[in-house]
Structures are given as C-alpha cells and as structure tokens.
C-alpha cells in the first residue's frame, strides 16, 4: 500500500511540473493560449484515468474490490490457502507380491497355483513311486531296478521249472530227482549206498566199492572152491 501511494505522489508531481511548464510557455505566446489550456486539461484527465485504473487493478488483485470482494472472501478456505492446488494423491500401484513374503516365495507359490489350475505336475514332484503304483503301470510286476531282490515264490511264478539257479544254487535231493528221473546228480551225491548200486547193476554191487567178498560169495561165483589168492 505504501509503495502504491508513493508511486501516485510521484506521478502527480511530474504532472504538475509539466502543467506549470506549459503555463509559462503560454504566457510567452498569447496566440496559443487556448490550445495550451485544452492541452493541460486533456493531460490531467488522461493521467487521472490511468491512475484510477491502476489503483482499481491493485485493489482487485488484493481481494478488496467492491464488486467481487464478497464472492472472493466467501470462496476462501479456512486456512487462507484457496489458491493452492489440492495435495497430490498417493498413486496406488499394482501389488506385485505381498510384503510378508519374499519374491522367491511368491514365485514358488505362483507356480504351484498355476500347476494346480492347469493340471500340470513337475517331474521332481513324482519321481518316487510306490510299489503299488508300479504294479498298476506294469502288469508283469514291479520294476526290477527298484526291486532287485525277488523271493523264491516270485521266481517260481516267473519260471515254471523252478527258481533261478543263480539265486538258489544249492538244490535238495528231492528237487534233483524231479529234474533227473534216474536219480540225483552224482556230483552232489557221490557216495551211494549198496542198495542203490544193486538197483543200478543187477549182478550186484560194484567190486571197486566192495573188494573184500565173503567165502560164501566166492563159492557161488566159483563152484570148484574159493580163490587161493584171497584165502
């Protein structure tokens, strides 16, 4: 306000100084007296209009104008900050992952949800299969890689002739009789009884096993009598 007043006083002093200067020139030249008076009046009116317009504009910018003063005061906010723009609102970005979980856990959870929705299963999840699952997949039985040790009963079912000789090398006498009708294998049973030799050789036992014969047997063998070499 003080600066505007000082400016107005300065303008008035300049106008008055110009008016007195023109008045002195008019006294020196009487023929131009009427022109000088109209010129002074015109200048004063022009300066007054300019000053009034400037003062009115200054009052309007301060909110003290007579026409718009009441409306401007009614629109003011309680904190006298009615010209300030509203505070910027926080931009809510899309939630990429929950703050409670790390990005790795979120990706793992997302992959599990995706597999569950699409019906896909990872190979690592189903590497270990049970024996029951293998039986359902392969009708012949479980995979020999997982179950290398098989029982005697399983081998009998697989091989009608009997178990695998690699697993069961020691066979009993009864099994050999079934395999070989003539009798057991002589490699397993080298010592045979006298009764078995009689069945094998109708003439009697093998002389290699029974070299010492009785006197009664020699009589039956040689009617002339026993051999003088033995007796």
From Swiss-Prot:
Primary subcellular site in the record, as a coarse category: secreted
Segments annotated as CLE- repeats: 136-147, 157-168, 178-189, 199-210, 220-231
Region Required for secretion from the host cytoplasm to the host apoplasm, residue ranges: 21-83
Leader sequence residues: 1-21
Residue segments, region Disordered: 116-231
Tissue: Highly expressed exclusively within the dorsal esophageal gland cell during syncytium formation in host plants.
Highest taxon, organism lineage: Eukaryota
Positions glycosylated per UniProt: 32
GO cellular component, one term: host cell cytoplasm
Keyword flag Nucleus: no
Region of interest called 5 X approximate repeat CLE, as start-end residue ranges on this chain: 136-231
Entry keyword set: Apoplast, Differentiation, Glycoprotein, Host cytoplasm, Repeat, Secreted, Signal
A- repeats: 127-135, 148-156, 169-177, 190-198, 211-219
Keyword check for Glycoprotein: yes
Protein localization: Secreted; Host cytoplasm; Host extracellular space; Secreted, Extracellular space, Apoplast
Region (5 X approximate repeat A): 127-219
Function according to Swiss-Prot or TrEMBL: Mimics host plant CLE extracellular signal peptides that regulate cell fate. May play a role in the differentiation or division of feeding cells (syncytia) induced in plant roots during infection.
Family: Belongs to the CLV3/ESR signal peptide family.
Listed name of the protein: CLAVATA3/ESR (CLE)-related protein 4B-2
Species of origin: Globodera rostochiensis (Golden nematode worm)
